[in-house]
């Protein structure tokens, strides 16, 4: 993992440099996530483990082992009490942060689980994967609440809306589905956002409800999902887009491409503010710290 520090007083320029390198993984880094207070960093690796780091010290706090295949996704619950991880072993694991202990193993997918995301109130968890289905789980009990069927190919990304009443899923069928979770029935309705011409590999909501999606077509779409409006389409990546993250103030959007670069965009104008280079290998993940001062990028580095 690498850190690129940002000068937030000069929003059009970034102070770029490696702050810390995390090199204890024994496989590619597929995902990274900060705790809500910014004190802890998660990394998910092809070696089957989730790594929990102290952000200031850079020290490895825990290595969460239990998956029987590469860990494809990981995230903290918004209340900071839980960690969710998903794997190619078809399962999702819920971990207690305080005790670094696995609380639930959620089984319901038939193939690799590529994405997990918590609802803003930390009460629900969404997952999706190669079986073309998304599942919404009740966190406390591990019970399946909704089975979401409608995509024609693998689901690679998911995120709840800020109000928790809808879920966005991105698929290799080139569409984004917005699922209405207000229904009390297990099966819910959805509508499509169509604008990409390639597999959708990542998406994320902003705090105000904007939705960004990245694709193999090398573009990023920024949507207003409630109106199906597409106010911005960002072009500049030369290879497909792997990861997206809004800054906490929503003025910037970071994107990691399947190359050794991370781009930072102005969310108002669509202009590329900076192209960050210097990754050792493919940039698999990017995320802002909760205070917006640092941008973290994860690469396929195994040493």
Curated annotation (Swiss-Prot):
CDD domains: WD40. Keywords: Repeat, WD repeat. WD repeats lie at residues 24-63, 66-105, 108-147, 150-189, 195-233, 236-277, 279-303. Transmembrane segments: none annotated. The keyword Repeat applies. PANTHER family: TRANSCRIPTION INITIATION FACTOR TFIID, TRANSCRIPTION INITIATION FACTOR TFIID SUBUNIT 5. This is WD repeat-containing protein 38. The lineage of its organism: Eukaryota, Metazoa, Chordata, Craniata, Vertebrata.
